UniProtKB/Swiss-Prot annotation:
Signal peptide: none annotated. It holds the Pfam family GreA_GreB. The keyword RNA-binding does not apply. GO terms for biological process: DNA-templated transcription elongation; regulation of DNA-templated transcription elongation. Residues 3-84 form a coiled coil. Keywords: Coiled coil, DNA-binding, Transcription, Transcription regulation. The keyword Mitochondrion does not apply. It comes from the Bacteria. Belongs to the GreA/GreB family. Necessary for efficient RNA polymerase transcription elongation past template-encoded arresting sites. The arresting sites in DNA have the property of trapping a certain fraction of elongating RNA polymerases that pass through, resulting in locked ternary complexes. Cleavage of the nascent transcript by cleavage factors such as GreA or GreB allows the resumption of elongation from the new 3'terminus. GreA releases sequences of 2 to 3 nucleotides. It comes from Mesomycoplasma hyopneumoniae (strain 7448). This is Transcription elongation factor GreA. The gene is greA. One of its GO terms (molecular function) is RNA polymerase binding.
Length: 160
């Protein structure tokens, strides 16, 4: 499964809520502020050499572009629902695995590329490790190829 399926964008419920919150802030705070900045800059007179006006207009363009981007994401969002109660790894699964050679244990959640945040242990479904794990089950030993091949054992799959 990819992050975009039939023109839908796969997101966790949490990520969708974050995007909606950002959109609300952009519309209700940032957009209002930049409109005021433009009005203030216009009141200074000649716009041909008004740096504040140019900066405010550029900022407005960035804000409006981000608003359109977020609205598109929201309109195409499909919430990821892991296979509840299943031991099969899917997008949305939290997975604990052990490196067979080193014994090192890692735990992370497989999410869409939009949701991915390695600092929060959320990896993209496009990453090599996720690609190796998707469709596998708790207890399976899987070969992962990231620069070099190594084997991992799936210790636990949590689908909530």
């Amino acid at each position: 499964m990819k992050s975009i399926v039939n023109d839908k964008i796969l997101l966790t419920q949490q990520k969708l809520e974050e995007i909606e919150k950002e959109l609300e802030h952009l519309i209700n705070v940032e957009r209002v502020n930049v409109i005021q900045e433009i009005k203030d800059a216009r009141s200074q007179g000649d716009l041909s050499e008004n740096a504040e006006y140019d900066v405010a207009r550029e900022k407005q363009g960035i804000i409006e572009s981000r608003i359109r981007e977020l609205e598109t994401i929201i309109s195409k969002a499909k919430i990821i629902k892991a296979d509840l109660g299943s031991s099969r790894v899917s997008i949305g699964s939290k997975v604990s695995l052990e490196n067979v050679e080193s014994g090192e244990i890692q735990t992370f959640q497989i999410v869409s590329s939009i949701d991915a945040d390695p600092f929060k242990s959320k990896i993209s479904n496009f990453s090599p490790i996720a690609q190796a794990l998707l469709g596998q089950h708790q207890g399976d030993e899987v070969e992962v190829d990231v620069n070099e091949k190594y084997s991992v054992r799936i210790l636990e799959v949590i689908n909530e």
